[in-house]
């Protein structure tokens, strides 16, 4: 049979083709409805544990032990609030954030938002490239340059999933996320952290961030938690569930989406906390307080734990983390392009363009700076995402506060105060981080 590339975008990556494709029986039991609605939150949670977050968590654990675990907890709670706003917007309006931005803002403003959103997609993909390339380098012993080149072939994975259905994609994501979780669970069993100290780390403490260094890392954790592309992604993929148009059905959908979001981000919280706990138990407790790179963490695990299994699991988790973002990045890119420009191209072309643009800084960085470029480029990707986040978060809050748009699903005043408070906090934290990186 002759092979040919698809001429049009195909499910499960194209928002119009998967909208309402997953049936949710309103007469089913509550537990069955929860299971049918589960999935969009899982895809969103992948952005909360991508390779861009690893370096910050590793440095925080190795330098300050368990003391910044409460920051991971608070940042995850903030993410839950923001993502619940996203799911509510998508269900209440039947449109995603990009579509609504195109409709409600002037053409120049909408085009600027589109450009910034596309830059954030490329920055996110850069972190995925670096994470996967580093995993190939650590697990296979190949050069970083060759590892970066290997990541170009993930476009074939996008092609392999054409016409497979959205639930198939969610199942694959579940396997990858479960792989990450199992790897870190086994890691913690091998390292045996002192759990009473771990529990104390979740207790909020101003003293723990009283100095400039821990405050810097705390802001880094907060600033890297909410990913701008996730806001567009979530408002779109929550519409994959087939629900009634009546008010009662939408209220039930909002409740089910909230459960899906909180449960999925709780899983991401456990993974991010596990990374910090791993670094604290393996490195800080043994006096290695200067571990700030993923490569250093990988190479130190074997001698400290006393076996090769720990480092192998670490590498496998890193690969699963980077690879899972391939799919969510493709969907988010389609949402942004279709929403802002009303333009649809084949998904494999979309993936190829984004990955090609992400490979350029990765190759140049490794060529000029060597292996040390990985950490610097990961930081760069987080800076770019921090710059873009307010431009996605602001319209989200404005729209969910708009009674004419949201109807009975409009934010109540406590939610408004909380949302604007998070906007000021996250934007201020990101601005402070950018100033620190600039100097």
Label the predicted regions.
Residues 17-22, 56-61, 84-109, 134, ...:
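Flexible loop linkers connecting adjacent transmembrane helices
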Residues 44, 71-104, 113-119, 324:
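Juxtamembrane transmembrane-helix boundary signature
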Residues 80-92, 238-248, 266-296:
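Extracellular/periplasmic helix-exit of transmembrane alpha-helices
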Residues 108-110, 145-148, 311, 315, ...:
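Loop-to-transmembrane helix boundary motifs in multi-pass membrane proteins
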Residues 114-118, 139-161, 179-183, 348-364, ...:
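Transmembrane alpha-helical segments of multi-pass small-molecule transport proteins
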Residues 150-151, 161-191, 389, 411-416, ...:
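Membrane-interface loop-to-helix entry segments
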Residues 155, 177-206, 215-236, 396-404, ...:
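Hydrophobic alpha-helical segments and their helix-loop junctions in multi-pass secondary transporters
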Residues 172, 348-356, 377-426, 430:
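C-terminal membrane-solvent junction of multi-pass transporters and transport-like membrane proteins
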